[in-house]
Amino acid sequence: MTKLSRKLQTQKRHRRLRRSVIGDATRPRLSVFRSNNHIYAQVIDDSAQKTICSASTVDKELREKSDKLPSDCNSSSIVGKLLANRAIKKGIKQVIFDRGGNLYHGRVKALADAAREAGLEF
């Protein structure tokens, strides 16, 4: 039996996860994408196929504070807080967390914990 690469394992988990995780207007989906250098998160209404709000480490608001954010848990928690604040301003308190096939550990967990601390419920 051949071993799948880490990227293929992540894609396989993501496809399996997306069958059950669907966001709507009352409870949209908080989707997370993690690359080697950056982390991206967005709140999506799947029924209308619209992105309600988003945040990432390449966000203009975060770039003004420092030129380059490191790819670590601290920058992920900053993104989580920023996303939660933007979602609450738009009137969203509850979301469904979509980890995007990534393991719930490290940068993904830091983003989720920071979003919870900032007021999002999931």
From Swiss-Prot:
InterPro entries: Ribosomal_uL18_bac-type, Ribosomal_uL18_bac/euk. One of its GO terms (molecular function) is 5S rRNA binding. Pfam families: Ribosomal_L18p (PF00861). Keywords: Ribonucleoprotein, Ribosomal protein, RNA-binding, rRNA-binding. The keyword Metal-binding does not apply. Transmembrane segments: none annotated. Residues 1-21 are annotated as: Disordered. It comes from the Bacteria. SUPFAM superfamilies: Translational machinery components. HAMAP family: Ribosomal_uL18_B. Belongs to the universal ribosomal protein uL18 family. Part of the 50S ribosomal subunit; part of the 5S rRNA/L5/L18/L25 subcomplex. Contacts the 5S and 23S rRNAs. This is one of the proteins that bind and probably mediate the attachment of the 5S RNA into the large ribosomal subunit, where it forms part of the central protuberance. This is Large ribosomal subunit protein uL18. It comes from Prochlorococcus marinus (strain MIT 9312). The gene is rplR.
